[in-house]
Swiss-Prot record:
<comment type="subunit">
    <text>Homotetramer. Interacts with PRMT3; the interaction is direct, inhibits ALDH1A1 aldehyde dehydrogenase activity and is independent of the methyltransferase activity of PRMT3.</text>
</comment>
<keyword id="KW-0963">Cytoplasm</keyword>
<dbReference type="GO" id="GO:0036438">
    <property type="term" value="P:maintenance of lens transparency"/>
</dbReference>
<feature type="modified residue" description="N6-acetyllysine">
    <location>
        <position position="91"/>
    </location>
</feature>
<feature type="active site" description="Proton acceptor">
    <location>
        <position position="269"/>
    </location>
</feature>
<feature type="modified residue" description="N6-acetyllysine">
    <location>
        <position position="435"/>
    </location>
</feature>
<dbReference type="GO" id="GO:0110095">
    <property type="term" value="P:cellular detoxification of aldehyde"/>
</dbReference>
<dbReference type="GO" id="GO:0006001">
    <property type="term" value="P:fructose catabolic process"/>
</dbReference>
<dbReference type="GO" id="GO:0045202">
    <property type="term" value="C:synapse"/>
</dbReference>
<dbReference type="GO" id="GO:0001758">
    <property type="term" value="F:retinal dehydrogenase activity"/>
</dbReference>
<dbReference type="GO" id="GO:0001889">
    <property type="term" value="P:liver development"/>
</dbReference>
<feature type="site" description="Transition state stabilizer">
    <location>
        <position position="170"/>
    </location>
</feature>
<feature type="binding site">
    <location>
        <begin position="246"/>
        <end position="247"/>
    </location>
    <ligand>
        <name>NAD(+)</name>
    </ligand>
</feature>
<dbReference type="GO" id="GO:0032355">
    <property type="term" value="P:response to estradiol"/>
</dbReference>
<dbReference type="GO" id="GO:0042802">
    <property type="term" value="F:identical protein binding"/>
</dbReference>
<feature type="modified residue" description="N6-acetyllysine">
    <location>
        <position position="495"/>
    </location>
</feature>
<keyword id="KW-0007">Acetylation</keyword>
Length: 501
C-alpha cells in the first residue's frame, strides 16, 4: 500500500505580521515584570523580526502560581471529563490546521526552516502528534490487583501536577506539541519556556489554546533566556516535573537543579552522535539517500543526526563518491524561496561553532570532499560539507556538530563496527543498512541507542516512544510510554469484610 498523499505546498504567507509577543499567563497577555524585551532574529537575513517580552524568575513565579491554581482539586480542569480534555486537544489540532500556513511561515522565518519542510513535516507531524495525544485522554487506565487477604486493591494513573517544559530552537513547534500534548492529555497544567531564538510559534499557539477553550492557567508560556527563566523553572519548589529538549550540557544543569530543589520528576531528550552503519550488501543508493537526509535535514540541526557514517571497506569509495554528488546538488538560500534545499543555521554562535569544527577536521587529517566554509555574505549559512578518511579520535567524529557536516568512516568487520559505534557517551539513535535479516537483528540489538532504524533513517511517528540511552537523556516522549511519563502511579488498598474471586 502507498503512503497517504501529502497536501500541496502553498506559497508562504506574504507580509507576515507577528501578532503575539507578550507573556501568556491565565489566558491573558502580560508585559514582563522587569519591563525588558529581547530581539528575535531572522537567521537568513540577520534582521530583527520583532521584540518579545523577556520573562525571568518573577514571571515564572506568576505562571507557576496560575498553573497551580488551575490544578487545584475541584477546579474546572481537574473535574473535567477525560473525554472533554481529548476534545479540547482535537479542537486545538483543528485550529493548527486552520492556521497551518501562518505557523509554517513563522517557523521558516524565525527558525530558518525550508518552508516546504515546515509546512509538510513540522506542521503535519505536530498536528498528528496532538491528535494522537487527544485520543489517549480517556484511555489512561489503572488496574485491579488480586492482593492477599481481605483487601481490594486498585491502581490509579494520576496527573503529576504543574509541569515545566523547556523547548529547543531546532523544532520549536513540534517539540512544543510533544511536550504539551501528553501533559494535557493526562490532566497536568504546564509552564512552557520556548527557546529565546524561536519563541514566535509558541506564542501564536497560546492564542489558539485560549480560542480552543482551555481553562485559564492550564497552559502558560514564558519566553526568556535559559539562565534566568529556564533556571527558575528547573529549580522552582512548586513545579512537580520538568521536561527539556536540548544539549547534554544544559540537561545536566536542569537535572542538578531538579535534585537540589524538590526532586521534581525529569524527562530529558539531549544530544547525540548517532552512528549509521552501511554494510556491503545494502542497497547503496538507498543508504546514500537516507544517510544524506539523516545528517543534512534542517541544516544538520537534529538531535538524531546521522553524524557518524560507518561504511564497509569494499563499498567505501563508491559510497563517498555518491554522497559527495548528492551533497553538491543542494541549493542554499532564503528558506521561503521555492527550490531551496538548505536554509541558515539558527544563529551566529552555532554558525561559528560549526565552522570551528570543520577547521578541526581539516587540521586533524580528514579529507575534505566538498564544502567546508561559510556560504554567502548575509545570514548564518554553512556550505554542505562532506569529510572522508575520518578516524574515531577526531573532534568531528566525537563532538556533536549540529550542522550540515557528514563524516564518513571505514570498517572491516561487524564486531569492529559495533564496538566503535557504541564508543560514545551518547545513545540517542542509530541506523543499519543491510539486506541480511540476521545481521540487522544482531546489530540493532547490540547498538546502545533509544531508536534503531533499519534500511531507513529519521522515521518518527507519534505512536512510537522516543528517547535516549546514556547521556542522550532520561525517559521517553510519545507513544504509550511517553504518556505515562506525565502520570504518577498510585496504589489504593481497601480493607473489606470478605474477598471473593
Amino acid at each position: 500500500m502507498s503512503s497517504p498523499a501529502q497536501p500541496a505546498v502553498p506559497a508562504p504567507l506574504a507580509n507576515l505580521k507577528i501578532q503575539h509577543t507578550k507573556i501568556f499567563i491565565n489566558n491573558e497577555w502580560h508585559d514582563s515584570v522587569s519591563g525588558k524585551k529581547f530581539p528575535v532574529l531572522n537567521p537568513a537575513t540577520e534582521e530583527v523580526i520583532c521584540h518579545v517580552e523577556e520573562g525571568d524568575k518573577a514571571d515564572v513565579d506568576k505562571a507557576v502560581k496560575a498553573a497551580r491554581q488551575a490544578f487545584q482539586i475541584g477546579s474546572p480542569w481537574r473535574t473535567m471529563d477525560a473525554s472533554e480534555r481529548g476534545r479540547l486537544l482535537n479542537k486545538l489540532a483543528d485550529l493548527m490546521e486552520r492556521d497551518r500556513l501562518l505557523l509554517a511561515t513563522i517557523e521558516a522565518i524565525n527558525g530558518g526552516k525550508v518552508f516546504a519542510n515546515a509546512y509538510l513535516s513540522d506542521l503535519g507531524g505536530s498536528i498528528k502528534a496532538l491528535k494522537y495525544c487527544a485520543g489517549w485522554a480517556d484511555k489512561i487506565h489503572g488496574q485491579t490487583i488480586p492482593s492477599d487477604g481481605d483487601i481490594f486493591t486498585f491502581t490509579r494513573r494520576e496527573p503529576i501536577g504543574v509541569c515545566g517544559q523547556i523547548i529547543p530552537w531546532n523544532f520549536p513547534l513540534l517539540m512544543f506539541i510533544w511536550k504539551i500534548g501528553p501533559a494535557l492529555s493526562c490532566g497536568n497544567t504546564v509552564v512552557v519556556k520556548p527557546a529565546e531564538q524561536t519563541p514566535l510559534t509558541a506564542l501564536h499557539m497560546a492564542s489558539l489554546i485560549k480560542e480552543a477553550g482551555f481553562p485559564p492557567g492550564v497552559v502558560n508560556i514564558v519566553p526568556g533566556y535559559g539562565p534566568t527563566a529556564g533556571a527558575a523553572i528547573s529549580s522552582h519548589m512548586d513545579v512537580d516535573k520538568v521536561a527539556f529538549t536540548g544539549s547534554t550540557q544544559v540537561g545536566k544543569l536542569i537535572k542538578e537543579a531538579a535534585g537540589k530543589s524538590n526532586l521534581k520528576r525529569v524527562t530529558l531528550e539531549l544530544g547525540g552522535k548517532s552512528p549509521c552503519i552501511v554494510f556491503a550488501d545494502a542497497d547503496l543508493d538507498i543508504a546514500v539517500e537516507f544517510a544524506h537526509h539523516g545528517v543534512f535535514y534542517h541544516q544538520g540541526q537534529c538531535c538524531v543526526a546521522a553524524s557518524r557514517i560507518f561504511v564497509e571497506e569494499s563499498v567505501y569509495d563508491e559510497f563517498v563518491r555518491k554522497s559527495v554528488e548528492r551533497a553538491k546538488k543542494y541549493v542554499l538560500g532564503n528558506p521561503l524561496t521555492q527550490g531551496i534545499n538548505q536554509g541558515p543555521q539558527i544563529d551566529k554562535e552555532q554558525h561559528d561553532k560549526i565552522l570551528d569544527l570543520i577547521e578541526s577536521g581539516k587540521k586533524e587529517g580528514a579529507k575534505l570532499e566538498c564544502g567546508g566554509g561559510r556560504w554567502g555574505n548575509k545570514g548564518f549559512f554553512v556550505q554542505p560539507t562532506v569529510f572522508s578518511n575520518v578516524t574515531d579520535e577526531m573532534r568531528i567524529a566525537k563532538e556533536e556538530i549540529f550542522g550540515p557536516v557528514q563524516q564518513i568512516m571505514k570498517f572491516k568487520s561487524i564486531d569492529d563496527v559495533i564496538k566503535r559505534a557504541n564508543n560514545t557517551t551518547y545513545g540517542l539513535a542509530a541506523g543499519v543498512f543491510t539486506k541480511d535479516l540476521d545481521r540487522a537483528i544482531t546489530v540493532s540489538s547490540a547498538l546502545q541507542a533509544g531508536v534503531v532504524w533499519v534500511n531507513c533513517y529519521m522515521i518518527l511517528s507519534a505512536q512510537c516512544p522516543f528517547g535516549g540511552f546514556k547521556m542522550s537523556g532520561n525517559g521517553r516522549e510519545l507513544g504509550e510510554h511517553g504518556l505515562y511519563e506525565y502520570t504518577e502511579l498510585k496504589t489504593v488498598a481497601m480493607k473489606i469484610s470478605q474477598k471473593n474471586s
